[in-house]
Amino acid sequence: MKTYQVDKNGYYGEFGGAYVPEILHQCVENLQNTYLQVLESDSFKEKFDQLLRDYVGRPSPLYLAKRLSEKYGCKIYLKREDLNHTGAHKINNTIGQILLARRMGKSRIIAETGAGQHGVATATVCALMNMECIVYMGKTDVERQHANVQKMEMLGATVVPVTSGNMTLKDATNEAIRDWCCHPSDTYYIIGSTVGPHPYPDMVARLQSVISEEIKKQLLEKEGRDHPDYLIACVGGGSNAAGTIYHFVDDERVKIVLAEAGGKGIHSGMSAATIQLGKEGIIHGARTLVMQNEDGQIEEPYSVSAGLDYPGIGPIHANLSVKHRAQILAVDDDEALEAAFELTRLEGIIPALESAHALGALAKVNFKPEEVVVLTVSGRGDKDMDTYINYKLS
């Protein structure tokens, strides 16, 4: 049977793999040899499920958005990842990875963060497990997501502002990898998305797959069937999208729509529409689609959303795109901002700017009245209030 899941060598079609400096070979190989044994063990599953239930507050609701549904002429359910502890889907992954890190005997945790949500989720589980935590964050993002920086510091993490390059997510990831190279024996790197060398894209997708597992059960209760007609999610690196589609990716009855950041317009030179603009290349240890110039130098991405301005894309999504399994839509800054205000006014839910890109895709698809659409609200909008207020003032 045709599958879009990872193969035994860590590839999704031609994308994926592990391209790492020699100093990290041993680290990455240990992780490759260990992660499935741990993730599939009964003791891990029991602890992971217990923490998701009692600490994160799962299952997250599947909410029928009636007024939004009326507007777009179909049945729209919102998967409410914004209601998780820490306000986004990121905690699903950090809880799983910190349990794995402890099993591997690591004592020091590092992470990269863009919008700060993964940083907060990592600092949170480090506080929970009493482990040292260092978070790398681009200086640009430190300034635009200051509330999350304060949360991380309150949780006991050291936040390191990164001043190289564009001073955003890509640069923070580079610094985290440098740190890992210097401390391979005692340090575990919790990557926040379905990016990086194998096994990270698969591991993060598996840990986030609790989202699609719940969607199946919840739809069965609400609609009498376990699959929607459409799944819609935003993609930066792609972890909330990977979790949303995980149990449906091989079910051709389900259409997949991925919304990437169009920035100021896909041809403006100020965008993060990696799938549509990228060419095959290697970034942060994985072969995937990368925004690059003629000489193969990585181009600086741009998005109003700090969580989506990444110049690569998870290899799972690169593969879904080239195989035409997913429809890729670029949603620009203004479309996302308008969609955020629309959801707020229609349903009383203020979404994260990242999630607003998924909402912005609704206007670009023609739905039929009987179709069931599940859209993942990956996070809540608290961290983006300054951007929202400034947008309305302008």
UniProtKB/Swiss-Prot annotation:
Its cofactor is pyridoxal 5'-phosphate. GO terms for cellular component: cytoplasm. The keyword Cell membrane does not apply. CDD domains: Trp-synth_B (cd06446). The keyword Hydrolase does not apply. Pathway: Amino-acid biosynthesis; L-tryptophan biosynthesis; L-tryptophan from chorismate: step 5/5. Pfam families: PALP (PF00291). Its EC number is 4.2.1.20. The modification N6-(pyridoxal phosphate)lysine is found at residue 90. InterPro entries: Trp_synth_b_CS, Trp_synth_beta, Trp_synth_beta/beta-like, TrpB-like_PALP, TrpB-like_PALP_sf. One of its GO terms (molecular function) is tryptophan synthase activity. Keywords: Amino-acid biosynthesis, Aromatic amino acid biosynthesis, Lyase, Pyridoxal phosphate, Tryptophan biosynthesis. Tetramer of two alpha and two beta chains. The beta subunit is responsible for the synthesis of L-tryptophan from indole and L-serine. Belongs to the TrpB family. This is Tryptophan synthase beta chain. It comes from Parabacteroides distasonis (strain ATCC 8503 / DSM 20701 / CIP 104284 / JCM 5825 / NCTC 11152).
